[in-house]
């Protein structure tokens, strides 16, 4: 997980309104979003989609296959995929391109990123009317695949897409964190995996795992290399530890509260 849930800022199932999505992303002075009556199948559209995939080939193929399937259903819509390895780079590029009118039609984002994008004039398309469209919206009758209905989206997740009276994203991507434990090694060190994992347990077992044999190899695995504990995202680790320790991070106004002695002690 990366700070907050990732959201897709323009709904893929609603790409039937491609021209409007294009018009609603860009620099200053764009016209306000207007809900069309019908999807114009006589026109061809190209939508740019910025996504993240960690250089994971499996994930890349998922994107590519989804786009291929979508384009087969909607032959007059082409999706131009651009992959990033960092969410921050997507955010920075969107901000940069707002000024030049070259923002993507669709991108993966965080809720706090959307709040920044909204400082532009009509930069992000509100999705409320699109959600509610009986033909092309969530669970719409004219959607050419088995799209989700609004009732099938977890309300709490959808609420995170709501800003100043409108929905601007859909939670089609969610992240979660899991801890994987090498039970064999833990028990070899003389410990039992607890039902509820604590940081104290992690630190104690990690320290015990560093014991070495006379030849310099680690006792627990007999190898020259051992990483007793690794957290994929150190950013997430700090945020989780702040939250679990009851320390402040930020408030609803966006004020940073993490620059204090408590944070220093964790770092």
Feature roles, as predicted:
Residues 72, 128-135, 159-267:
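Helix-loop-helix "hinge/cap" segment bordering the ligand-binding cleft or interdomain interface
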Residues 54-56, 86-89, 112-115, 175-178, ...:
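Solvent-exposed loop/turn segments at secondary-structure junctions
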Residues 35, 146-147, 157-158, 164-167:
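Short, P/G- and charge-enriched loop/turn segments at secondary-structure junctions
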Residues 42-56, 77-82, 106:
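Short, well-ordered beta-strand elements
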Residues 69-152, 188-190:
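Extracytoplasmic "Venus flytrap"/periplasmic binding protein-like
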Residues 55-78, 180:
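Short, polar/charged alpha-helical segment
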Residues 1-47, 72:
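Short, low-complexity disordered leader/linker segments with a strong preference
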Residues 60-67, 91, 95, 111, ...:
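Extracytoplasmic/secreted envelope proteins and their assembly/folding machinery
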């Amino acid at each position: 997980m990366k700070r907050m849930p990732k959201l897709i800022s323009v709904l893929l199932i609603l790409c039937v309104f491609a021209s409007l999505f294009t018009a609603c992303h860009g620099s200053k002075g764009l016209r306000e979003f207007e809900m069309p009556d019908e999807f114009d199948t006589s026109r061809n559209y190209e939508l740019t989609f910025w996504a993240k995939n960690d250089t994971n080939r499996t994930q890349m193929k998922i994107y590519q296959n989804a786009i291929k399937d979508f384009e087969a259903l909607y032959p007059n819509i082409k999706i131009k995929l651009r992959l990033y390895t960092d969410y921050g780079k997507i955010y920075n590029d969107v901000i940069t391109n707002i000024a030049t009118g070259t923002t993507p039609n669709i991108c993966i984002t965080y809720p706090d990123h959307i709040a920044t994008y909204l400082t532009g004039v009509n930069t992000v398309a509100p999705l409320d009317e699109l959600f509610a469209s009986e033909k092309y919206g969530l669970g719409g009758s004219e959607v050419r695949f088995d799209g989700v209905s609004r009732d099938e989206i977890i309300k709490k997740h959808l609420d995170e897409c709501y800003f100043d009276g409108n929905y601007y994203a859909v939670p089609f991507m969610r992240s979660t964190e899991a801890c994987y434990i090498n039970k064999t090694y833990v028990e070899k060190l003389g410990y039992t995996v607890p039902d509820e994992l604590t940081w104290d347990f992690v630190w104690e077992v990690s320290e015990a795992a560093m014991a070495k044999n006379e030849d310099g190899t680690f006792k627990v695995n007999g190898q020259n290399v051992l990483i007793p504990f690794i957290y994929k995202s150190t950013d997430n680790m700090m945020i989780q530890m702040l939250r679990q320790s009851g320390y402040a991070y930020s408030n609803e106004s966006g004020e940073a509260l993490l620059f204090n002695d408590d944070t220093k002690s964790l770092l």
